[in-house]
Design a protein with these regions (language model features):
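Non-catalytic helical "accessory" subdomain of NTase-fold nucleotidyltransferases
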Residues: 1-232
């Protein structure tokens, strides 16, 4: 277990964005922010989800919400995203535009040609706020009880991504669902899961997580104890 835990720690360091990428992400968001402010004075581009909480992989998409204020505070989301999309298309740094205005949360997706990052952008303060608040409110405070949570999120997300299962709109599981699965597993294995993220803790928890969701039989150890197989 300790050897696997050391590999997990090395992988997290390798897979996390470095300082240059973090600066590129910030610059990408500032370019979008300037476009939004020209449309809706006082508005602000802000990251959400895994981007905000630093649970992102190197080169992963940049998730941004345009928070509108004042007389634009309650702008209809479809109208807002159409307006923003039209302006973003005029920018020389925006390529490969892909609008999705008919979904539950209308958004535009484009590649920033300077940073090479794909940006996914939504507008407004109603449905989008509820979605990001749902991510922030129950998951992040609860995860603080489990020091290994953020460390394990990256390798777990990578496994789902390698198998093409990271897109929630395509039937997969996005960051929020992966986080809830991991929290559910860690909550079932307290107090072991409340210990510092040492190599043996990381290795045991990662193996136990996949055995649990694979309906593997439990062996009764501190990382593999459940009363019945998990069933989808």
């Amino acid at each position: 277990m300790e050897g696997l835990g050391e590999e997990i720690a090395d992988f997290v360091e390798y897979a996390s964005p470095d300082a240059d990428e973090l600066r590129a992400r910030f610059a990408t968001m500032r370019r979008l922010d300037s476009v939004a402010k020209a449309l809706w004075p006082g508005s602000e581009a802000e990251p959400f989800g895994s981007t905000k909480h630093r649970m992102l992989l190197h080169g992963s998409d940049l998730d941004v919400r345009i928070r509108t204020v004042g007389k634009f505070e309650n702008i209809p989301e479809c109208h807002g995203i159409n307006q923003l999309g039209a302006e973003v298309m005029k920018q020389p740094w925006a390529v490969d535009m892909d609008p999705k205005v008919t979904g539950r949360v209308p958004q535009i997706s484009y590649v920033d040609s300077i940073s090479k990052l794909r940006c996914k952008v939504c507008v407004g303060n109603r449905q989008t706020v509820r979605g990001t608040s749902f991510f922030n409110s129950p998951m992040i405070p609860l995860s603080m009880r489990f020091p290994a949570f953020k460390v394990l999120m990256l390798p777990v997300k990578t496994v789902f991504k390698q198998r093409g299962l990271e897109k929630s709109f395509a039937g997969g599981v996005g960051t929020f669902r992966v986080g809830m699965m991991l929290l559910n597993y860690l909550a079932m294995h307290a107090p072991a899961s409340t210990r510092p993220p040492t190599p043996d803790v990381l290795g045991g928890a990662l193996i136990g997580f996949f055995r649990y969701y694979a309906s593997a039989p439990a062996d009764g150890s501190e990382w593999q104890k459940w009363t019945e197989p998990f069933a989808f």
